[in-house]
């Protein structure tokens, strides 16, 4: 989860988020090298006393500064497209959960079970217990099994919302009349926090998301107790 004065990303909890972090580092390295080269050239131009006003044509230079940026863009685009297609893949999910956005709470339905659904509201600050996080705790957490592919169906009952959990690399728009889907898989147990990431009204900041990823045996006990 996030912490005060954090500069980087949250710790990756899913394979997709790990890929996104690697892509971020890959792109940042390219940008850093280009920026260093440009800064070096600018420094040379500002400090040198030599002038060259007779150059009218430089085809070699023009060829290089056309081909080189194209190669750099390809090196950025290929891994980006790979991750984009990975995020859209939904292959034989073990569990499907339907998420509906409301002003201003989330409702969840485990579609593989006959009657397992609930609403998830933020716990007011006055009702928090010691150790709980302000504006992030909910009365009903979304309990899911870890190390299993889970499909999330996301939509909205009223206005635009966005269901986002940064440590899992998830951000899916909840659009009225449209059903979007995404997949998640956690590589470790724990509590993972998110929030609505689309301005949806006066209480937009009070729509937290809490996922509790647990081993399968604990999930089965929880689901049995909820039915």
From Swiss-Prot:
Reactions catalysed, as given in the entry: 4 Fe(II)-[cytochrome c] + O2 + 8 H(+)(in) = 4 Fe(III)-[cytochrome c] + 2 H2O + 4 H(+)(out)
Molecular functions per Gene Ontology: copper ion binding; cytochrome-c oxidase activity
Predominant localisation class: mitochondrion
UniProt entry tagged with the keyword Metal-binding: yes
Mitochondrial intermembrane side: 1-14, 88-227
The keyword Transport belongs to this UniProt entry's keyword annotation: yes
Cofactor stoichiometry and binding remark: Binds a dinuclear copper A center per subunit.
GO biological process, alphabetically ordered: ATP synthesis coupled electron transport
Family stated for the protein in its record: Belongs to the cytochrome c oxidase subunit 2 family.
Membrane-spanning segments: 15-45, 60-87
Mitochondrial matrix side stretches: 46-59
Subcellular location, record wording: Mitochondrion inner membrane
Name listed for the protein in its UniProt record: Cytochrome c oxidase subunit 2
Topology class, membrane: Multi-pass membrane protein
PANTHER family membership: CYTOCHROME C OXIDASE SUBUNIT 2, CYTOCHROME C OXIDASE, SUBUNIT II
Positions annotated to bind Cu cation A1: 161, 196, 200, 207
SUBUNIT field: Component of the cytochrome c oxidase (complex IV, CIV), a multisubunit enzyme composed of 14 subunits. The complex is composed of a catalytic core of 3 subunits MT-CO1, MT-CO2 and MT-CO3, encoded in the mitochondrial DNA, and 11 supernumerary subunits COX4I, COX5A, COX5B, COX6A, COX6B, COX6C, COX7A, COX7B, COX7C, COX8 and NDUFA4, which are encoded in the nuclear genome.
Catalytic activity, EC: 7.1.1.9
């Amino acid at each position: 989860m996030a912490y005060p004065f954090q500069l980087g990303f949250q710790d990756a909890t899913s394979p997709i988020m790990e890929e996104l972090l690697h892509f971020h580092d890959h792109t940042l390295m390219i940008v850093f090298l280009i920026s260093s080269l440009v800064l070096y050239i600018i420094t040379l131009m500002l400090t040198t006393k030599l002038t060259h006003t007779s150059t009218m044509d430089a085809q070699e230079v023009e060829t290089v500064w056309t081909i080189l940026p194209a190669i750099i863009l390809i090196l950025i685009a290929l891994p980006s497209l790979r991750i984009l297609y990975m995020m859209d893949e939904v292959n034989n999910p073990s569990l499907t959960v339907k998420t509906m956005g409301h002003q201003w709470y989330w409702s969840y339905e485990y579609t593989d079970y006959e009657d397992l659904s609930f609403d998830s509201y933020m716990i007011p600050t006055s009702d928090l217990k010691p150790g709980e996080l302000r504006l992030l705790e909910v009365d009903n957490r979304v309990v899911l099994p870890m190390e299993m592919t889970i499909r999330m169906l996301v939509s909205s009952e009223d206005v635009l919302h966005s269901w986002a959990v940064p440590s899992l690399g998830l951000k899916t728009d909840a659009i009225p009349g449209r059903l979007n889907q995404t997949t998640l898989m956690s590589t470790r147990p724990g509590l993972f926090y998110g929030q609505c990431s689309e301005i949806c009204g006066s209480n937009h900041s009070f729509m937290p998301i809490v996922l509790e990823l647990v081993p399968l045996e604990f999930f089965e006990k929880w689901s049995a107790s909820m039915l």
